[in-house]
Amino acid sequence: MNAVANAASFDDHKVADLSLAGWGRKEIAIAETEMPGLMAIREEYRAAQPLKGARIAGSLHMTIQTAVLIETLVALGAEVRWASCNIFSTQDHAAAAIAADGIPVFAYKGESLDDYWEYTHRILEWPGDVGPNMILDDGGDATLLVTLGARAEKDASLLANPTCEEEEVLFAAIRKRLAAKPGWYSRIQAGIKGVTEETTTGVHRLYEMQAKGRLPFPAINVNDSVTKSKFDNLYGCRESLVDGIKRATDVMIAGKIAVVLGYGDVGKGCAQSLRGLGATVWITEIDPICALQAAMEGYRVVTMDEACDKADIFVTATGNVGVITHDHMVKMKDQAIVCNIGHFDSEIEVAAMRQYTWENIKPQVDHIVLPNGRRIILLAEGRLVNLGCATGHPSFVMSNSFTNQTLAQIELFCHGAKYENKVYVLPKHLDEKVARLHLKKIGARLTELSDEQAAYIGVPKEGPYKPDHYRY
């Protein structure tokens, strides 16, 4: 079948180029061979169709791996509308392949902020003037749009004082929708059974909403499943960070001083990859436990004030705001590389650098010319470097994350009534199931407990093997 011809009468999408669909389909087929968890879930649940009746609004990087997730959700009965959760992260051939198969997708690499929020609205608009009943989120923007819009219907002052360019665009988009369709956000919010959240930043938003009594539906924190955070965040970043830096700059990493800001799971993976390629790695941390971990691994733990004029490569991985400041950047060495692997672009004070001359080298690579004549290299305008300058994490590790997402969607859609408006994590037995589904692919074989051994340590032979408080 000609995928592009198949999509000729289907216009509920916005992608860069539908003619890329064939290329995308070939890469999706390869990715499926590296995503055993998702393929096993398709096989296990296809007949039961547990997501039949689900209308899932998806806001997650529109990559080849995400295409496999989308098609898994559809195979289990769901209707899906999709947008990317980052303006630079879309792989256009992946989006084209999904659109060519008649699935509404709104994403292209290099979106404007206006388009970004327009597309996030589009995933909430379903034929027949109905909305989604599930959200699958990465970073929390789809959830934010629905909940902030509903609150602004009652208190317009919430949109009065944007603190950055992104908020200016978001608030304007909400005001426009409020004028055109009064009460629309509240109707959408009322129809949502639950949300599953992919990443650290989005989970932080959910817990904030819960603490303030503003979470209007149940949420599952996928990020803190062990098979997500200890694999995607650690091993995924260990491979995709240096892929992004090298594709963008062709720089030799060996011999350089690299600073990783933040030593959580993401920072740990970044530090390992940079050290593995021969860099001297320094760490900045606010948490004494993480700082001690870094020091015990042989990294030098410093402050940015100490490091800013000495290092060659800077990577933010904190999930915080303003960790690399204007004052840090103006002190940096000539040709210092600055990038971010946290979800949002707020970790680096990019806006403060707009006062200087910018020279675009190629897409997502800019020279910022400082008054002293030195130039620093900013990657992906401070957004996710591994997706802006490369293609993100490998398929295998994303299979772990997306298998969790699929199981979480099934759980909330099928059993949502038993959940309060709180944030939950998937139970340990499902975490272990996700891991088990991936062992055969990499040639790993489990040892089985004897009855005597299981009784001795007090666990079932089939698991779970660890208590919920166990730290892997």
UniProtKB/Swiss-Prot annotation:
Pfam families per the UniProt record, alphabetical: AdoHcyase, AdoHcyase_NAD
SUPFAM superfamilies tied to this protein: Formate/glycerate dehydrogenase catalytic domain-like (SSF52283), NAD(P)-binding Rossmann-fold domains (SSF51735)
Keyword field: Cytoplasm, Hydrolase, NAD, One-carbon metabolism
Residues annotated as binding NAD(+): 199-201, 233, 262-267, 285, 320, 341-343, 386
Reactions performed catalytically: S-adenosyl-L-homocysteine + H2O = L-homocysteine + adenosine
Annotated transmembrane regions: none
InterPro entries in alphabetical order: Adenosylhomocyst_ase-like_sf (IPR042172), Adenosylhomocysteinase-like (IPR000043), Ado_hCys_hydrolase_NAD-bd (IPR015878), NAD(P)-bd_dom_sf (IPR036291), S-Ado-L-homoCys_hydrolase_CS (IPR020082)
Binding site for substrate: T63, D138, E198, K228, D232
GO terms, molecular function: adenosylhomocysteinase activity
Subcellular location: Cytoplasm
Pathway it works in: Amino-acid biosynthesis; L-homocysteine biosynthesis; L-homocysteine from S-adenosyl-L-homocysteine: step 1/1
Enzyme class: hydrolase
Any single GO CC term annotated in Swiss-Prot or TrEMBL for this entry: cytosol
Keyword NAD: yes
GO BP, sorted A to Z: L-homocysteine biosynthetic process; one-carbon metabolic process; S-adenosylmethionine cycle
Listed Gene3D superfamilies: Adenosylhomocysteinase-like, NAD(P)-binding Rossmann-like Domain
Needed cofactors: NAD(+)
Binding note for cofactor: Binds 1 NAD(+) per subunit.
Functional note: May play a key role in the regulation of the intracellular concentration of adenosylhomocysteine.
UniProt family annotation: Belongs to the adenosylhomocysteinase family.
Protein name: Adenosylhomocysteinase
Organism encoding this protein: Methylococcus capsulatus (strain ATCC 33009 / NCIMB 11132 / Bath)
Gene assigned in the entry: ahcY
